[in-house]
C-alpha cells in the first residue's frame, strides 16, 4: 500500500535536495508544448518514504485526447512523427534530478540514439507500458517534485529533508567510450522511379558510454 501523506510528514520537507535543468529552446512548437505539459503532470508529486515513483503512471495516457501533440519521436533507429514527442526530455531531466538526490533507480533505459539535450548515457527513455522511469525514495521523509518548463528551459527540482543526504552531494559524469561512425544503407523501393533516391533517415553518429556517480 502507498504510504499515507500526512501534514506531519510534509513538514519535514525543508529544502532542495537536487535540481537539474535542460534546454529545449530550439524545439518545434508541438514538442515545446509536450515538454511543458508533461512537466505540469509531475509537478507537485510527493514520493513518500519507500514509495516507488512511476513516470508513466503520473503522465497517464499519451494520446491526443489527453492533450498531447504531434512531435518527433524515436522509433528504433528512426525519428518519426508521433503523439507525445518531448516526453523523454522530461523523464531524462527527472532521471538526472533523481540521481543527484541519490534516489534508488528501479527502472531506466537509455534511448536507441543519442539525444541533443544530454550527454550519452545520461538519458531515460519512456514508451507506452513497456519502458518506464521508476525510482524509490530511500529516505525516512517524503520528497516533493517541482517541474516547470518555460518554452526554453526545463527545470526539475526535488525537495526533501536536507539532513537525509547526510551532508553528501552527488555528481554524475558521462564518459564516451567509443564513437560509431554513421553508415549509409541503400534499400530498393518499388515506389520510386529507377535511378531516383530518397533520404529516409539522415545518418547519425552513435556512441557507447559509461556513466559514473561521484559522492
What residues fall within each predicted segment?
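Well-ordered beta-sheet/strand-loop patches within structured domains
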Residues: 1-215
